[in-house]
UniProtKB/Swiss-Prot annotation:
GO biological process assignments: protein refolding
Description of post-translational modifications: Under oxidizing conditions two disulfide bonds are formed involving the reactive cysteines. Under reducing conditions zinc is bound to the reactive cysteines and the protein is inactive.
CDD domains per record: Hsp33
Main location as per UniProt: cytoplasm
Organism name: Pseudomonas putida (strain GB-1)
Protein name: 33 kDa chaperonin
PANTHER family, sorted: 33 KDA CHAPERONIN
Gene of this entry: hslO
GO cellular component: cytoplasm
InterPro entries per record: Heat_shock_Hsp33, Heat_shock_Hsp33_C, Heat_shock_Hsp33_N, Hsp33_helix_hairpin_bin_dom_sf
Disulfide cross-links: C234-C236, C268-C271
Localization per Swiss-Prot or TrEMBL: Cytoplasm
Lineage start: Bacteria, Pseudomonadati, Pseudomonadota, Gammaproteobacteria, Pseudomonadales
Function: Redox regulated molecular chaperone. Protects both thermally unfolding and oxidatively damaged proteins from irreversible aggregation. Plays an important role in the bacterial defense system toward oxidative stress.
């Protein structure tokens, strides 16, 4: 089989003779779309790409209808990394950073000291779920692995990479007892697939998923499922920005317009699109007329 030409997708796979499943993610165009909207230093680009890969892997592994949000926060040079991915596989991401404090060779603990990772599942129907753990690991791959150690009974490992404008990720997870009823056999099998994944070299991540999986597990019966395409999309809109003004209340919204010299600018932190509202726009909002799509919007 030839490598798939798609650049942005997740693909699940399973070991037919082991109680182990996996998932691969490839992000080229969507990662590039995020980076094109901001001038991030290289360490920020890399961490944001890794977080995008992890988010896509989690969406691919879960069955829900809604939005998954990952936030990494700290009091350090990178106070925030944030990625959102919907069950429709639309992804966006952003970061906040202190430019003068970003050395090129800084470690995760230096860039995000005393950080924590928050996972939020916001379903279309049902109750919202949120879990927070410390950023415990030398890199984001270790942090996500440790997150799952604390939150799930099944062994789970992450490998994340974002270099050369490409974001990649690999997830391995031990399945409930089925093909391998013996405890020792299950543990040996798990350690075997993990040990092979650890041999991945940085330069190999850019290779096709099927080539890489064959190189790692050519002695195993590995079954690939259909790919799930991903794409960049920002959910911001003039309507949502107008709703943010409405939430302030009419008096405060009008006062804000005056304080801003007659026009309020609302910027999307994800895609950098800017929405402008003057006094007549705000009056229309509170008169129940909604937002005027023809009003000025800038990139």
């Amino acid at each position: 089989m030839s490598d798939l030409p798609d650049t942005d997708f997740t693909q699940r796979f399973i070991f037919d003779e082991r109680d182990v499943r996996g998932e691969w993610v490839s992000l080229d165009d969507s990662y590039a779309a995020v980076l094109a909207r901001h001038e991030y230093p290289q360490p920020v680009k890399a961490l944001l790409g890794e977080l995008m890969a992890a988010t896509a892997l989690l969406v691919g592994a879960m069955k829900f209808d809604g939005l998954l949000i990952l936030q990494a926060r700290s009091a350090g040079p990178i106070p925030l990394l944030m990625v959102e991915c919907s069950s429709d596989c639309e992804i966006r991401g952003m970061a906040r950073y202190e430019a003068e404090q970003i050395p090129a060779d800084a470690s995760l603990s230096q860039l995000m000291p005393d950080g924590h990772l928050t996972l939020t599942i916001d379903p279309v129907k049902g109750q919202r779920y949120q879990g927070t753990v410390d950023l415990d690991g030398a890199n984001l791959s270790e942090c996500f692995t440790n997150y799952f150690i604390q939150s799930q009974q099944l062994n789970t490992r992450f490998w994340l990479n974002a270099e050369g404008g490409k974001a990649r990720g690999l997830l391995l997870q031990q399945l409930p007892r089925d093909r391998q009823p013996d405890d020792e056999e299950r543990e040996d099998s798990w350690q075997h697939v993990v040990a092979l994944a650890k041999t991945l070299k940085p330069e190999e991540w850019a290779e096709g998923n099927e080539t890489l999986l064959h190189r790692l597990y050519h002695e195993d019966a590995v079954r690939l499922f259909d790919i799930q395409p991903l794409r960049f999309n920002c959910s911001c809109s003039r309507e949502r920005s107008g709703n943010a003004l409405v939430s302030l209340g009419e008096h405060d919204a009008k006062a804000l317009v005056e304080e801003c010299g007659g026009t309020v600018e609302i910027d999307c932190q994800f895609c950098n699109e800017r929405y402008f509202f003057d006094a007549s726009d705000v009056a229309q909002l509170f008169a129940g007329g909604g937002t005027d799509v023809a009003s000025e919007t800038r990139h």
